[in-house]
Amino acid sequence: MSSLSAPPGGCGGDVAAAPATATSTATATATATATATATGSMEPAMVPRTANLLACKQWWRVCFLYGDQQKYYRQLYSKAAAQRLAGANQENDNAARGAGAGEGEGQEYDTVAMGDGDFIAAQLDAGEDVDDGIDLGDSSQPGGGATPTATATAGRPLFPLSSSPRRSKKLLRSLRAHVKGESRPEKPAKAAKPQSEPSSELTKRNARVTVLDDPFLFGIDADHLGDLVRGKQYSPLEATENIAKFYELQLETTEATAQVLEIIEQEEEPPEPPKPALPPKQKQPRPVPPLPARITQPAVLQPLTAGDLQFLNLSLRHRSLPRSMKPFKDPHDISFTFNELDTSTSATAAAAAAAVAAADVATGVGVGSSQQESNEPISRTPLTQISYLQKIPTLPRHFSPSGCPQGLPPPPALAGCGSALGLPSSSSASALYAAQNGGMLPTSPLPLQRHQQYLPPHHQQLPPLGAGPGQGQGHGLALGPGGAGLPQYSPAVSGCSSTAKYSNAQLPPHHHQLSPALSTPSPPSLLHHPAAGTSASAHAPFLAGPHMDMQRQSHSDDDSGCALEEYTWVPPGLRPDQVRLYFSQIPDDKVPYVNSPGEQYRVRQLLHQLPPHDNEVRYCHSLTDEERKELRLFSTQRKRDALGRGNVRQLMSARPCDGCDELISTGDIAVFATRLGPNASWHPACFTCCICRELLVDLIYFHRDGRMYCGRHHAETLKPRCSACDEIILADECTEAEGRAWHMNHFACHECDKQLGGQRYIMREGKPYCLHCFDAMFAEYCDYCGEAIGVDQGQMSHDGQHWHATDECFSCNTCRCSLLGRAFLPRRGAIYCSIACSKGEPPTPSDSSGTGMYTTPTPPTQRVRPQTRITSSHASSSPPMSPQQQQQHQASFNQAMYQLQTQQLEAAGGPVSQSQSYATSDSDAGVVKDLEHCRSGDHAGGGDFTDFSGGRASSTSHNMSPLNSPGDFQPHLMPKPMELQRDGVYNFNEMSSNLDTAWPAKPPLGATHSYQLQRQLMENQHTSSMPELAGKGPMLQHQMAAHFGQQPALHSSAQQFQHEYADIMHPPPPPPERGAVGEVPELPTPNLSVASTALPPELMGSPTHSAGDRSLNTPLSAHSATHGPTHPVSILSGASSSSPMSGEPAKKKGVRFEGIPDTLPRSRSYSGNGAGTSGGGDKDRDRDRERDRDRDRDKGGDKDRESGRHGPGHSSRRRRRRKSTSSTSSGNHHRSGSGHRSHSTTRADTYAPAQPLSSSYQGPPSVLQADSETAHKSPRQQREREREESAEESDVCSTCSSSSSSSEDYMMMYQLPQRRHYGGVRVSYVPNDALAYDRKRKPAEMAGDKDKNCIIS
């Protein structure tokens, strides 16, 4: 269009030439960019459209062929490009001169082709010298006022590599200026007239050039190109008019330079044709006469040369070349369609293989040929028609580039604003033009995406546009003022261009010039850049609003650019509005918008669904001659017999979808596949491969037996595909394994390539591995010995941990007894055979010997290994330490504990020190640390541990270890438990005696009241279960009360500790009430830890804990005292261990060792813990009921155990184990029942059988609840929960219970299913965890008691 000529001010022409020539025009553009830019900008806009159309076709071909796209394009266009470049160089030179002169050369800008070779070079040079966006501004300058703006714009290189769009625009403008040099508008008013003339002349020339495949490379459809071409047709005249108008506007805003006037004058002649050109946007190349000239030249679609391709590569981001700007097809006629004939030609030129596939696809092939023909595909309503003015109302929907006017699906194009944003629409010329217009994108038709790349997110363009003027250049820039516009169009440069064009509409004259040449109009847009520079703000606002709307509402039938430029591919033969309707029925993430995930998806699917090696021998490896022939035959036959391409049409009448059987409504878009029948139709989203259910890329399908396949899966229905090389297996022999096939020599280790034929291998993720590589890459390491577990070795796995399936590795961490085929208790990263072992009290050291054992604490070293497994209470929450670390840790812990215990024994009355020693008695150094924390906490009056800032936090964290948890109540008791643990077995009677002895010493610690409450509870419980302790209970309670009295928080922590310890089965730290016990050095800490749970304090634990709470709160104490007996009794029963300690078997709940019932009830009671504390009675009862049910399940075992527990005859060892288990379970239950009391209860319950727990839990819960309620329930509950959590970790047995952080979790964990999940069921000697889980689950359901109880005795 004469828009280039319009900016002939030397610059205009030069600019146009500059892109192509890369000569002084670029420099001139830099210098006189303002003037030339306007023109140049206008011209390039046209080219991109045509180019885009061609590019779309070529793109399709390339994609279909699966060949190297660039290579394919080079093949297709190298020759044409060379010719075009030669012609373009000449024309560009002329155009540049004409542009500089401001003469009619502008009219010849249409011979964008001239710029192809030189044009590209010029674009590059121009980009280097001056930003094209700026140049565009210059082009506007010739219009008049544009010069200042252009100059400002020129400040930044229009086509720098970073902002290639501008350079592209320059090139287009220069080319157009060449072609249209004559038609360049002398004046804005005159320009309107000349536009038509220059448009027609130059449009023809440029149309040929536009046919160049930049747009095609961009993936722009032929339709878009056609629209561009049409735009060119119109652009000379209309461009001139538009330019003239634009210039007028700019002149109004800025001075009109002599060059501008000259340009306008030159364009004045063509302006008459331009008017028709604008209408052609409607589908008529009104500047047809000029366009024909242009078309004639464009008709020669020369393949791009390597140089062209290089330039294109650079230009891909600078799509400003006016390729195929021929107005062959009316913009309306030009719809993104691929002509099969064209296809074949193009396909052949591009890549034979690709062409074949394209040909089969038919439509795809058409794309390439269309480009070659370029007349039709490229032809498009000139951008001038599209002139942004349309947005403005000036341009008719012809404004193909924008396509918005036509109400095309260009709304994305409206993203034209986006183009201002610098959003490129790689497939649509309008996008290119928009970018060019915006001065953002290069003129080259390369995908706007790439332009964007150069101009980061379209914004590079925008930044210049950001400046009012810059925006003005490409009304995408103009959008700058209407910022909204840019963002909206950011999706597609085409939209941007449309927007820019529409912005130009503001400058109707100028814009029209630029606009008419989508080839040229875009340049007008560029011109508008400069002009807009002056009036950018005006344009931008206009552009932002109306333009955006125009693009969105593009009404031009032929202007697929507006609607289509935002897509990298569109179904052939559709109008923009139909294209939008089509894509509206496809998932957004699969719509191939430019630079979107949908575009990436399409590219991936092209390669996946149409594998190049299925069609072309050159893509295959190691084929024999026979196989090569067979592949050719195979490919040819497939294409002949099965290949087809869907035809998209708008239904005139409703019909059912062959995919989903639902009705496709009248007026909806449907896809037809003629190979499957003339009436076979699908929803766009239902047109998928029957195997992979993915959308058939570019509607290319293969049919067989009435079903549609993608290329890949159709080939696999005929021949096997090698899983290694992904090629079709044409050989007579192949290896098949696990439903897959391999070439004989391809079935090898995925890692070392060792042939696996006839050898053992392991499949992982569909890839075979030799045993050696598999072990090296995927073998798990044994948690015990640290050695890799080979594929030939048995492996036990649980919760991310792995062991050799040997007696040595998969064994109890404490007593080292084999756990193969047995239930085990996972805790703190280690596995145990029982709760006692998990607490560091080896059950093996005769429980009956408990007294002696606990009396003489085992040396730390003795307990080191078990404790090693059981990390400190902290360890319970933390991953298990390595055995050595654990041993070391435990050794230090034991030593510390031993010392603490000794100190405690010496200073039995010293609650704090005792508490400390007890804390250490937990299990390992971690516990010792916890104890230390407890000590400091206790001394401070806070919890034993830091966690018990209130005497509870640390306890909670340490609760994990039996001692530490109880240590909360101050490790006083903990040292004993430590000793108990060391002894591993102790006489509960002795323990009770010791406790009694110790308790009296402890009274100093506790408040008498709390102690009494505890004592009463203990006495009641103890009386029933542990008379000994009952007697001494008061002292312990006093001590505890004193201790608690010292620190209510401490009481909480103590209670927490007690509960935890009870849970841990390391009663070592009874509750803080036990602090007294802690004082009692007599009770061996280890035993205490075992019996601690059962200790009166522990029993008091429920009571005691309650007592501790009571000591904290007298009401609680009273309440505990009131309910204490019941709960304590339950606890005592539950604290069978305590009972054993007291020597009484009276605990009906005594030692319920049933893992399942106890565990489940425990978990329930534990979960109900907090609740129990607050409403414990009901919750406890419910939990008790659940326990009862569980018990009923496990009744046999439980009752037996319970009777044993109840029976005084139980050996302390048995009792202790049971107590440990049951105490843990019952303790957990109680804890779940009530927060604080649950701690003491936890211990007592731990010893008590599940049923007793239920009873005790129910009974005590009320008491405990009352206590906890009386005393701050929430704090207690929280503390108890914390303790319980730690205790859970310590106490929980995979079979008996799970160690979860909350009482509810405990309950849940204790439930059969949960325990199974936790590993509560014994891990069977099965390589598959799932099998083991199932086995565990069945026994749990059947006789969960046995399985879940980690049967210890």
UniProtKB/Swiss-Prot annotation:
Disulfide bonds: none annotated. Residues 179-189, 1177-1205, 1269-1284 have a biased composition (Basic and acidic residues). Residues 548-656 form the PET domain. CDD domains: LIM1_Prickle, LIM2_Prickle, LIM3_Prickle, PET_Prickle. One of its GO terms (molecular function) is zinc ion binding. It is a peripheral membrane protein. Residues 952-962, 1111-1120 have a biased composition (Polar residues). It comes from the Eukaryota. It is found in: Cell membrane. SMART domains: LIM. The keyword ATP-binding does not apply. Its main location: membrane. GO terms for biological process: anterior/posterior axis specification; establishment of planar polarity; establishment of tissue polarity. Pfam families: LIM, PET. Residues 130-206, 266-292, 500-540, 840-892, 933-962, 1062-1303 are annotated as: Disordered. Interacts with dsh; PET and LIM domains interact with dsh DEP domain, in wing cells. Interacts with Vang in photoreceptor cells. This is Protein prickle.
